[in-house]
């Protein structure tokens, strides 16, 4: 029996990992594999997904659709094909442009044989930030253009008017794709029993992902506790200059929390002990952001930290 293969796309912070966790819960009696891709070298989402019952491969430091990682992705798919999974989910980086997926799947077939049944590309669209993201990065349009199903997230915040705006934008880009809505991963998952590829709109094309277009990522490491109010002030200073910030911090009086920043929205969620606090920045300004990180951290937090590429 062939492995059912799904691709999850969606710009940074759209809720891919949340949705994937919900799908894994609903398939907990199945043999499942996950390929998880992040633009930086430290995998925050991989840490969230890690589970003894799930076999996971992490491909970091680039997009799996870029020449810098494409061959690694093909080989990972070929290797996973030998493990007789019932389902394999690929969660791509938020900046991933999947326009060349057909080419990649053909290469996997040459290496590993006809082991996969591709069920479809699912793209998540953040109702709060989608329109701004669409203007900022071409990958957002490509993700919608090449998806079979779009899932609009966070419409509980924007309401029906916000949902309709995003729906209309999606249909302008891809008139064929199926569109659903999800709030915090809650939705009808009956699509897992369907062939989403019937909703195909665009033909394969060259991905816009390249070494030259890869955004700068930086990693802040910090030992000890930090006050949530001070950390929040620092994060607020940085929101205009980043696509995304995410990580883990030991908050004074609160314990360990997962920190997630998309647009102006800052979320804290309790999590297990991670040893050292860390934060990933995906910069809109390239290396120019480094000076601001140091100056704002010193002003708002005032404790020693280390910043790495």
Task: Give, region by region, the residue ranges found by the protein language model.
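C-terminal accessory "lid"/substrate-recognition subdomains
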Residues: 2, 142, 146-277, 285-309
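Flexible glycine-/small-residue-rich
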Residues: 36, 125, 261-263, 283
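Short, intrinsically disordered/low-complexity patches at protein termini
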Residues: 56, 67-68, 113, 169, ...
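Nucleotide-state-sensitive switch-loop elements of NTP-binding domains
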Residues: 2-14, 18-133
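Phenylalanine-focused residue identity feature
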Residues: 11, 65, 73, 85, ...
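Charged helix-capping and loop-helix junction motifs
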Residues: 136-138
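Small-molecule kinase domains that catalyze NTP-dependent phosphoryl transfer to phosphate-bearing small molecules
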Residues: 121, 140-143
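A residue-level signal for conserved active-site and pocket-lining positions in enzyme catalytic cores
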Residues: 38, 121, 179, 231, ...
